[in-house]
């Protein structure tokens, strides 16, 4: 539903804005403010969305807690919204799992997969739906002449739907479960969505596909702002998928100026880290494939790499050991600014958990999504479109580095680095987008179907531009990133000035 301003986006934006406003007003008592906010966000005597103002406020209360980084609670727990706020009311608070949470009393308990005959059935003579059903679940209603499906016999294969000339048979699925490429969403005893965290990789696709807004993730909006207010030098590392996320007229120069107005010491483009990552992965590929490894998979998408390690542990060593663009950019910033704090601002929910890894925690202090950043801008009434342009724009990354944001871009950047130094080298590439496709790709690779290949996996269909923290329509973002990438001063990752820093950053 990215690119469509729904009621869910409206509520999420209000919550992010109010949390940011609360952080900026340090004179406000946080505990009391947390209790007041559900009434400010959902005013009046009647509900706007669910026809129950008390339920709406309760849901908003849990969303506020998650936006503060606090744990989600059940309806059975009797405690104020601000319960435990002391843990969040400080400048340095890391995310604690689980990151993605189902607010149970907001869940509609949608039915699981079901094949259904609609009123569009014409009761035709052919009835191909009956003929193709392998279980004899489709029969004819002698009164109406229409097809009916015995749900006890139906195995949800969808063959009947595929042969209906009138498209009168539909397959209904729980949206969150359908979006989950890890099959991590099931139903609890009340029919509510339940996340199996042993399977979940925190990609956030369930979050953006739930039509009831019952799934939410935790945030560090409050803590980031408090860190800036404390006087610490806080640097923004902005992922290349930012193009167009804050409006079609918001240029990189305007974004940089706006970030500085918020108090950030400076702004770096994570595409410079992507260039470094491409170079490191190219070197590792040439060194290890096929002599030491049967294939190599890219490492920049955390949901993809975590999925690979969970489902294919025997081939975990085939996931590139190269540092991700986020980590490399943060290291670069801290190398030149030793006492700095770094905020990664991007499209990805899974980056929040990547930042919790022991190997990354000292590099990346906070992670925010573009959607959360939009709330911060609104809290300070920053008019990005009319902001005076910062002539320096953002960092000088390459075309290939900026294209990391789009599916296929990572592998292309690595191949281009190899081809520059070894033009005779043949590089075989396979890529997948969406966790279902990614799982299939890795399954085939482990069976020996991709010997010597470079494999690229993107958990979100379309790449980073389709991440859970984006706001713009995916195709629009892909086009915008492509145009922005072409404006880079360098085509290839190995041509940028930052490449010389790589050896110092990965020692």
Segments the model singles out, each with a brief description of its role:
Residues 89-118, 135-136:
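N-terminal [4Fe-4S]-dependent radical SAM core
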Residues 105-111, 117-120, 163-169, 185-189, ...:
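Short, intrinsically disordered, charge-biased short linear motifs at domain edges
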Residues 126-151, 159-196, 201, 205-220, ...:
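Iron-sulfur cluster-binding cysteine motifs and their immediate structural context
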């Amino acid at each position: 539903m990215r690119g469509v301003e729904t009621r869910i986006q409206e509520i999420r934006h209000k919550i992010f804005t109010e949390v940011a406003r609360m952080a900026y007003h340090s004179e406000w008592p946080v505990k009391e403010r947390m209790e007041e906010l559900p009434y400010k966000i959902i005013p009046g005597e009647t509900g706007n969305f669910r026809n129950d103002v008390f339920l709406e406020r309760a849901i908003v209360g849990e969303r506020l807690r998650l936006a503060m980084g606090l744990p989600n609670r059940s309806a059975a727990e009797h405690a104020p919204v601000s319960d435990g706020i002391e843990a969040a009311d400080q400048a340095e608070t890391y995310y604690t799992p689980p990151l993605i949470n189902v607010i149970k009393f907001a869940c509609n308990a949608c039915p699981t997969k079901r094949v259904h005959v609609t009123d569009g059935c014409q009761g035709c003579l052919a009835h191909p739906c009956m003929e193709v059903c392998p279980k004899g679940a489709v029969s004819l209603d002698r009164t109406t002449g229409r097809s009916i499906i015995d749900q006890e016999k139906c195995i949800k294969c969808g063959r009947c739907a595929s042969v209906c000339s009138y498209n009168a048979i539909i397959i209904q699925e729980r949206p969150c479960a359908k979006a989950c490429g890890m099959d991590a969403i099931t139903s609890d005893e009340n029919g509510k969505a339940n996340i199996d965290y042993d399977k979940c990789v925190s990609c956030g696709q369930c979050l953006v596909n739930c039509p009831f807004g019952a799934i939410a993730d935790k945030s560090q909006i409050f803590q980031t702002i408090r860190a800036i207010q404390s006087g610490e030098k806080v640097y923004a590392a902005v992922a290349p998928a930012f193009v167009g996320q804050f409006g079609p007229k918001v240029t990189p120069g305007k974004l940089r100026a706006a970030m500085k107005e918020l108090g950030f010491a400076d702004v770096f483009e994570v595409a410079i880290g992507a260039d470094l990552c491409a170079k490191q992965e190219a070197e590792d590929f040439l060194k290890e494939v096929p002599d030491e490894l049967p294939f190599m998979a890219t490492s920049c998408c955390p949901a993809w790499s975590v999925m690979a390690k969970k489902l294919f542990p025997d081939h975990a060593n085939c996931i590139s050991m190269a540092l991700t663009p986020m980590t490399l950019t943060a290291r670069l910033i801290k190398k030149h600014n030793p006492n700095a704090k770094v905020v990664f601002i991007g499209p990805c929910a899974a980056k929040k958990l990547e930042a919790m890894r022991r190997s990354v925690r000292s590099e990346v202090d906070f992670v925010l999504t573009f959607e959360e950043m939009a709330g911060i801008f609104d809290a300070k009434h920053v008019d990005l479109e009319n902001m005076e342009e910062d002539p320096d724009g953002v960092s000088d990354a390459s075309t290939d580095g900026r294209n990391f944001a789009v599916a296929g871009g990572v592998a292309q950047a690595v191949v281009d680095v190899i081809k520059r130094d070894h033009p005779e080298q043949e590089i075989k590439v396979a890529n997948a987008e969406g966790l279902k496709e990614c799982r299939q790709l890795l399954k085939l690779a482990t069976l020996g179907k991709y010997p010597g290949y470079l494999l690229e996996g993107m958990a979100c269909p379309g790449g980073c531009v389709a991440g859970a923290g984006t706001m713009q329509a995916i195709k629009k973002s892909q086009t915008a990133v492509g145009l922005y990438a072409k404006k880079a001063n360098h085509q290839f990752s190995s041509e940028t000035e930052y490449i010389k820093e790589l050896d110092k950053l990965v020692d």
